[in-house]
């Protein structure tokens, strides 16, 4: 709990920006700011970590999602370290609910990468090589973090669900459990494993 305190995990949003469904996790309000109950934060963090460990132990793929600037580097680093897919740019509609199409685009990206590595781009006309190179870079930018995803994930981990609403909606629609940070402006009902913390203090 001390670690949570040191990173400022207890500071919520301004009281006027709160979601009433977060009331059970709020300890107090000071100077117009809601203060989260760190005892409950620590409890729910452990529950969420146990769920993630169980999913991983069962061989489930966990998709990490966090497009806000301060979340991008930690998400990419931790997901890569764990060998899991991630989304740190824009969430594209249908990334989960229309995964067949997304998988086709990932396959195209992999095919273009193979052609590039084989030196095919070097023997094309400059115009054609540039066209395919641009297409490859766009695919990498949009989907590069998802290259490990061969089927819909078994769990989704979201930083700031208030920003990643579409990701949570798609996961819920497919019955995929969602772990997510729950700041005081978040609707925790969209999370099977809410972690009540300040998601603006990513560490």
Where are these regions (language model features)?
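Conserved acidic residues
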Residues: 153-154, 192
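N-terminal cationic and glycine-rich segments that engage phosphates or anionic surfaces
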Residues: 1-61, 67-68, 72-116, 126-133, ...
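Active-site phosphate-binding and catalytic loops of NTP-dependent enzymes
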Residues: 11-13, 121, 141-149
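Internal active-site segments that recognize and position negatively charged phosphoryl groups
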Residues: 154-172
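Short gly/ser/thr-rich secondary-structure transition/capping motifs
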Residues: 136-143, 159
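A generic local structural motif
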Residues: 49-50, 140-146, 166
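Short hydrophobic alpha-helical runs that function as membrane-insertion/retention elements
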Residues: 62-65, 85-88, 157, 177-182
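Short glycine/threonine-rich loop/turn motifs
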Residues: 166-203
């Amino acid at each position: 709990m001390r670690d949570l305190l040191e990173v400022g995990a207890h500071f919520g949003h301004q009281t006027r920006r709160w979601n009433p469904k977060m009331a059970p996790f709020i300890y107090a309000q000071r100077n117009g700011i809601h203060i989260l109950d760190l005892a409950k934060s620590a409890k729910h963090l452990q529950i969420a970590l146990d769920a993630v460990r169980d999913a991983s132990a069962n061989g489930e793929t966990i998709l990490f999602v966090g497009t806000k600037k301060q979340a991008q580097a930690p998400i990419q680093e931790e997901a890569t370290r764990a060998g899991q897919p991630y989304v740190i740019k824009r969430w594209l509609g249908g990334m989960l609910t229309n995964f067949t199409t997304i998988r086709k685009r990932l396959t195209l990206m992999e095919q273009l990468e193979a052609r590039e590595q084989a030196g095919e781009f070097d023997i094309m006309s400059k115009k054609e090589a540039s066209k395919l190179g641009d297409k490859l870079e766009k695919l990498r930018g949009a989907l590069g973090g998802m290259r490990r995803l061969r089927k819909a994930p078994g769990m989704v981990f979201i930083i700031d669900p208030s920003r990643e609403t579409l990701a949570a909606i798609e996961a819920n629609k497919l019955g995929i459990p969602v772990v997510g940070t729950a700041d005081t402006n978040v609707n925790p009902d969209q999370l099977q494993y809410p972690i009540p913390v300040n998601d603006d203090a990513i560490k």
